[in-house]
A protein has these predicted regions:
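Short, charged recognition helix plus adjacent turn
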Residues: 1-6, 39, 67-72
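Short, Lys/Arg-enriched C-terminal cap helix and immediately downstream tail that follows
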Residues: 15, 49-50
Length: 72
């Protein structure tokens, strides 16, 4: 698994935990499939740019944070 996928999965897991969100609830709130969230968390697929934007907007973080280009 690439470093970006690992960092993304770790950060998404962290953000979901803070918000107490399940995979299905996050998927519903940002308009994607639950299977997409599952694939991201297990490093099977990378999110699209559109999905990254949705996640960044939802969690109020930058896309750079999500993919590990900035620390905080």
């Amino acid at each position: 698994m690439s470093t970006m996928k690992i960092i993304f999965a770790e950060r998404l897991t962290y953000l979901m935990k803070i918000e107490n969100l399940s995979q299905s609830e996050l998927a519903r709130r940002i308009g994607i499939s639950q299977s997409a969230v599952c694939y991201w968390l297990y490093g099977k697929k990378e999110p699209s740019i559109d999905s990254l934007w949705k996640l960044a907007d939802y969690f109020d973080v930058t896309t750079d944070y999500l993919i590990g280009r900035e620390k905080d």
